[in-house]
Amino acid sequence: MPHTLLILNGKESGNPEVREAVKNVRDEGLTLHVRITWEHGDAKRYVEEAATLAVSTVIAGGGDGTINEVATALMSLPADKRPCLGILPLGTANDFATGCNIPLQIENALQLAVKGRAVAIDLAQVNGEHYFINMATGGFGTRITTETPDKLKAALGGVSYFIHGLMRLDALKADSCKIHGPDFHWSGDALVIGIGNGKQAGGGQLLCPDALINDGLMQLRLLTAKELLPAVLSTLFNGEKNKNVIDATVPWLDITAPNDITFNLDGEPLSGRYFHIEILPHAIQCRLPPNCPLLG
């Protein structure tokens, strides 16, 4: 069997369940290398090392940010030398893994990441150098996910993002911008901007419910209203129609703003006044369960 490399977020290096799952894989006679990340840039270095280890799969062990860092590093390799991506969900929200029906039980998730079916999936590229595998959020949604205290996330998991968001309703500020894509033009003030390759963000909220990771498209969702915000947020996440929620499905978008906007790319903040976002169809192979609801 080809070798596998697990890139593990340093926060999980002492996790006894991870150690047991790794031991069980090795006891089957499979070669599983493990590398620990301690600072930004480690994942890229380990992905580059994967080429010298004859690795066919690189597993991201951590949350959505770790998955993003590993997927971004994979894109720096030539397409014909790019290992498959495996996912071991160990974060707070685990939005991409949950959306894919990847098991949250560590043993089962690692077995899938090592042996699962490899499927070609899309990635979204931002300004030619940044990527997201799940979702980019702007406006209020970004401030929730980037400012939610670590202690609250640890205590409450994904629901902490929503609770913290409700606590911050008095601090709402819309982002003024223009958004342009194929047969789509919009300008105005957006409270929430969601651009989904995957369906959910912020700890399980279905922000882009129609998104798929292998259709060459991304779903854009805008929330434009400030009035009766709790009711509008409920509409945004439960799929009901509302004139303040704008939807589009496109292969690319240009976003311009008079002031800096911060987008959260799978947990990684990126600020600026211009964003070109496009889907790269079938950019990487990912080991996914057969019942993955993000596949078309």
From Swiss-Prot:
Chief location bin: cytoplasm
Positions that bind Mg(2+): L212, D215, L217
Record-linked InterPro entries: ATP-NAD_kinase_N (IPR017438), Diacylglycerol/lipid_kinase (IPR005218), Diacylglycerol_kinase_cat_dom (IPR001206), Lip_kinase_YegS (IPR022433), Lipid_Phosphate_FormReg (IPR050187), NAD/diacylglycerol_kinase_sf (IPR016064), YegS/DAGK_C (IPR045540)
Superkingdom of this protein's organism: Bacteria
Coiled-coil residue windows: none
Residues the record lists as binding ATP: T37, G63, D64, G65, T66, I67, N68, E69, T92
Stated role: Probably phosphorylates lipids; the in vivo substrate is unknown.
Protein name: Probable lipid kinase YegS-like
Organism: Yersinia pseudotuberculosis serotype I (strain IP32953)
